[in-house]
Amino acid sequence: MGGVAIHATLLHTDDVLFFQYVEGSPTTDHTSLVQTYNWRTGVVSQAATPYRRDIFCAGHNLLPDGRLFIAGGHDHNTGKKQDGIGVRESDVYDPIGRTWTPTPLLGEPRWYPTNVGLPNGKSLIFGGTQSPGVAARTVDEYDAVTNTMRTLGSAATKTVGQYPRMHLVPDGRILKSGTSGTSWFFDPVGARWTSGPSMVYGSRSRGATALLEGAGTVLTAGGGAPTRTAEVLDTSQATPRWRSTGSLTYARVLSNTVVLPDGQVLIIGGGQAFKYTNPVKVPELWNPSTGIWSPMAPHQASRMYHATALLLPDGRVLCAGQDNGPLARFAEIFSPPYLFRGARPTIVDPPASVTRGGQLRFTSAEAVSVAKVVLIRSGSNTHEINTDQRSVPLVFAVSGTTVTADVPSSGNTLPPGYYMLFAVNSLGVPSTAPWVRVL
């Protein structure tokens, strides 16, 4: 791929934007190697910022118009970079014009922050560190429409750690599900925190999380010592409680998760110690109905510290990264079992955009065999987190070759932005997804 995909985002242009650090000399310091990889054509292109900016170790999320918002990043030091030193810069990348625009400064420096997009199109920035041992405790809010940044009130102030695992759930709150042993909820409207239930296992340092199909339940797996255990939290319950699910075949830290069109979850990469020791090269597929993890075909490269994984519109999974070893600059693509069960359904004449609370229609010659219609948001992944990833199944009806689906009205379930539209047949085989913008 030319560079190492330490950060990776799937864009609605079919490019994957990825970036890594550059270090070692005054001429390259405070810069990053930024490139795009087109998954359809295999073409790699340069996408560097036109100004000196180190976006390595930043947080990022996709905006409603498909641009990428990047907050914080790495230090300004000359020579080898020092971990933990944050910056206040943030930027927006436009995949159509392939342009970069600086945005207003964050309220405090951030290294290893987490971004979360909101139903109103704004973005919140949580956590990270200002400098080694000094936490970034405030919450910043970026409004892309007005291009303004503000820091929320003192009730939002809390130490949440580096790259906290955060997910927007259907009641409008944001769940923090790692890496400490206690979960928390943040209310964006009231801008305040409330405590949530403790995890069964306790602290899952460098564990993986995934927002499951429907966007109301969170899975967390691995992390810690490491552990093979996994657990889930259904936030729709009156009194949510973490409950154990099936254990992984392999204990692992530093892994990434991908929610597939059939609703199953792939955990990929990781290893049995930080950072590059005893890699686990066998992905596992989790069935939410049974709680069972099944080993899959191994990948060739180690995918531990600084690795990434993303669902592609054709239902395959791109895995890349880990910043050492002979295969660091090579990506691999995994084909899940559903791609070996026969022909795909097809989607013809999909809408370019839909409105929440409305309907979407498309034509499919295989409409009678369609068992699921699902919108899956583009992923934006780094350091075992992907707050953009969400899968929302739609209620639908079939009439002849026409499929009509209801689009949820709640922005908490379906935040604005670009989604992949999948039709999945009764064998679990997904179509290739067109892009649909949810307004």
Feature roles, as predicted:
Residues 1-439:
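Kelch-like beta-propeller repeat domains
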